[in-house]
A protein has these predicted regions:
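Short, low-complexity, disordered segments immediately C-terminal to signal peptides
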Residues: 15-42, 52
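Bacterial N-terminal signal peptides
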Residues: 1-9
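Exported/periplasmic cell-wall-interacting domains
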Residues: 377-379, 413-415, 425-431, 436-525
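Cell wall/extracellular polymer interaction/catalysis modules
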Residues: 314, 326-429
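Extracytoplasmic
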Residues: 72-74, 81-83, 120-122, 256, ...
Length: 525
């Protein structure tokens, strides 16, 4: 059931149930430490919070981001599986307007059920819509054993990283930790693989296992019971280079270590390369810095000093760091140099990503000035501007820029005339609207490549989405299959900033134009 139709391409691809887009294969993060004189991307700068303790976000933050504030005394619906649909009326006919997720819950608007097509017990939930409570997929009993198990491993939506993540080396998933015989039947290369594991544990460098955490788990297996089969994604085989999400639970069984996936399946730990935590974050322009500023993308970039002989290099600006800029510029041949604000350092504009705000808002008001256009949109008048070639993003509230960061567009750059952007992994240009928001979303591409539980996904056109990327930290550079990648920290900030708001307890929401405003997204060169 797609959100706005079904697509499955090598770029932005089919997402299970609600549609989104899949970026291309994972790239290993390569953290760079900044010099002391510029701001690190993983630190918000002068006194701002670090990435390991990020702020909740700009607005629209529920008291309990998981939607599991169960001690408030208000009756709730509790989700025991994925995609517990929320419908506009007590009927499964028509289009859903949102959904709950495994281990989540939402308050009831009315404790009395209603009968309607598709379900005997429809319950009205906050702030709108109806959920079918059948006891299997959803329950009113917070002490339901299946729900309590699901809640234990629910996505951590109060964190930019709802799960742990890694890259598949090619693996099989199991409903229970398998016996050695079951493993041999499902994994034809098991004997050779386990021999490589033992060699690597003995200290030999085994290239095929580089990055794999071979430490034996110490946990004890638990029974995954009391939940419907729909709690699991419909795949047992994960192809190499796919990105997978998993919980904190690691167990040892049948002489092997196992990880419990985000959808409560068991995966062999020795076939997964954990991703380093991506900690890059953008700049809050209301708290940390002001425009103009510059980011450094791709690699460390030269730092210049102005001398009587001209501009000479005197060090580097670290990759993914940023600086505020002064209004002092000098032209030398084809190069333009700008002085760093409050410093004797200079940078070359061609070696930095410098966000350049539009002169006007999408409705014609002057940016940076009071809005006297008389055309201000309803709601908070939020909009986002993205430069595909520049690799940057600016978020606005009304006429004011409020956030700046780096993004990774499609690896194909700009669309080619006469070619479908999906064919070239390009990011489309134009004006779009956020039409669906999903706290996590598994994305599926051709050849069964997946990116599991991609965080902070916001659809804006067909299979294209703005979303967090946990599999690389090369922001500012073209990386995706056409979607707009941001860091998980930036993804969560933007998810909470944009309209429509994700209601408390919901995991996904469809934009309903008749009820609420939506954030405009402008994608340009």
């Amino acid at each position: 059931m797609g959100l706005f139709g079904v697509a499955c391409t090598s770029a932005c691809s089919e997402r299970e149930e609600p549609q989104a887009a899949a970026p291309k294969a994972a790239a290993q993060p390569d953290a760079a430490r900044p010099l002391a004189t510029e701001h690190a991307g993983e630190d918000a700068g002068d006194g701002g919070p670090r990435a390991d303790a990020p702020e909740a976000g700009p607005a629209n933050v529920p008291s309990d981001p998981k939607g599991n504030d169960e001690d408030d005394g208000v009756p709730r619906v509790y989700a025991k599986t994925r995609f517990v649909w929320i419908w506009p009326n007590p009927s499964s006919e028509g289009q859903w307007i949102g959904f709950l997720w495994t281990g989540g819950s939402v308050r009831l608007r009315d404790p009395e059920p209603r009968f309607g097509p598709g379900c005997r017990h429809w319950y009205a939930v906050e702030p709108r819509g109806y959920v079918c409570v059948d006891g299997d997929r959803a329950t009113l009993d917070r002490d339901d054993p299946g729900y309590r198990l699901a809640r234990r491993f629910a996505a951590k939506l109060d964190s930019p990283w709802p799960h742990r993540y890694g890259e598949s080396l090619g693996l099989r998933r199991y409903a229970t930790p398998p016996t050695p015989e079951q493993q041999r039947l499902r994994e034809p290369d098991l004997r050779a693989h386990l021999e490589r594991v033992e060699r690597a544990r003995s200290g030999e460098v085994v290239e095929a296992l580089l990055g794999v955490d071979l430490a034996r788990a110490t946990g004890t297996p638990i029974e995954i019971a009391g939940l419907p089969r729909s709690v699991h994604e419909p795949r047992n085989r994960i192809v190499p280079r796919s990105a997978v999400a998993f919980t904190d639970l690691e167990v040892f069984a049948h002489d092997r270590s196992w990880l419990l996936s985000a959808d409560l399946m068991w995966m062999p730990k020795d076939r997964i390369v954990p991703y380093p935590t991506v900690t890059f974050r953008g700049v809050d322009l209301r708290k940390t810095a002001t425009l103009p500023l510059a980011f450094f993308r791709g690699r460390d970039r030269p730092r210049y000093e102005k001398t009587p002989e001209g501009f000479v290099r005197k060090g580097v600006f670290a990759r993914l760091s940023w600086v505020e800029l002064s209004d002092r510029q000098e032209r030398v041949g084809d190069d333009t140099y700008v002085q760093v604000r409050g410093s004797e350092d200079w940078l070359k504009t061609s070696e930095a990503a410098i966000p350049e705000p539009r002169a006007t808002t999408p409705w014609g008001a002057a940016v940076g000035k009071p809005d006297d256009s008389g055309k201000t949109p309803e709601g908070r008048a939020t909009w986002i501007e993205v430069s595909i070639l520049g690799g940057w993003l600016l978020a606005y509230e009304g006429t004011e820029p409020v956030y700046a960061t780096l993004i990774s567009p499609g690896s194909g750059g700009l669309p080619l005339p006469g070619r479908d952007p999906l064919e070239t992994a390009a990011t489309p240009t134009g004006r779009f609207t956020i039409n669906g928001k999903f706290a996590t979303a598994t994305m599926v591409a051709p050849r069964e490549l997946i990116h599991g539980d991609v965080p902070w996904t916001q659809n804006f056109s067909g299979p294209y989405a703005l979303h967090g990327a946990y599999w690389h930290d090369d922001f500012g550079q073209p990386k995706s299959g056409g979607c707009v990648n941001v860091s998980p920290i930036d993804g969560r900030w933007l998810f909470e900033f944009t309209e429509p708001k994700l209601p408390e307890g919901w995991h996904g929401v469809r934009w309903l134009p008749r009820l609420e405003p939506s954030t405009t997204l402008l994608l340009r060169r």
